[in-house]
Amino acid sequence: MPTVNQLIRKPRVVPVKRNKVPALQANPQKRGVCTRVYTTTPKKPNSALRKVAKVRLTNGFEVIGYIPGEGHNLQEHSVVVIRGGRVKDLPGVRYHIIRGLLDTQGVKNRKQRRSKYGAKRPK
């Protein structure tokens, strides 16, 4: 434990907190327009074609958002809403596109965890 004199000479430094989702600007979600919809491959032990979209947000930021679930209807100029949440095996993808909102349709034939994928209750 440092002495009072040591603390006067060199005070304690509070570590700087880095914002993980800067483009949201402290909002829960942001609206944007897809500028490019494409697939990309994940980092090393995994292998797949992950669906992602480049989105220009209303605040001018351009971010990459992950499209969750099986199948989607997004194309260029689709209006989407993004939320925070990175995809661990896709470098640079720090946002998720919310399904079942604006131009994004929910996942078809989804029985479980439906609210996460914008799917209506099956009859």
Curated annotation (Swiss-Prot):
Gene3D superfamilies cross-referenced by the UniProt entry: Nucleic acid-binding proteins
GO molecular function: rRNA binding; structural constituent of ribosome; tRNA binding
Taxonomy, superkingdom: Bacteria
Residues that bear 3-methylthioaspartic acid: 89
Keywords tagged on the record: Methylation, Ribonucleoprotein, Ribosomal protein, RNA-binding, rRNA-binding, tRNA-binding
GO CC annotation, single: small ribosomal subunit
Signal sequence interval, chain numbering: none
Keyword rRNA-binding: yes
Keyword Lyase: no
GO BP, sorted A to Z: translation
Family of the protein in this entry: Belongs to the universal ribosomal protein uS12 family.
Subunit structure: Part of the 30S ribosomal subunit. Contacts proteins S8 and S17. May interact with IF1 in the 30S initiation complex.
Functional description taken from the UniProt entry: With S4 and S5 plays an important role in translational accuracy. Interacts with and stabilizes bases of the 16S rRNA that are involved in tRNA selection in the A site and with the mRNA backbone. Located at the interface of the 30S and 50S subunits, it traverses the body of the 30S subunit contacting proteins on the other side and probably holding the rRNA structure together. The combined cluster of proteins S8, S12 and S17 appears to hold together the shoulder and platform of the 30S subunit.
Protein name: Small ribosomal subunit protein uS12
Designated gene of the protein: rpsL1
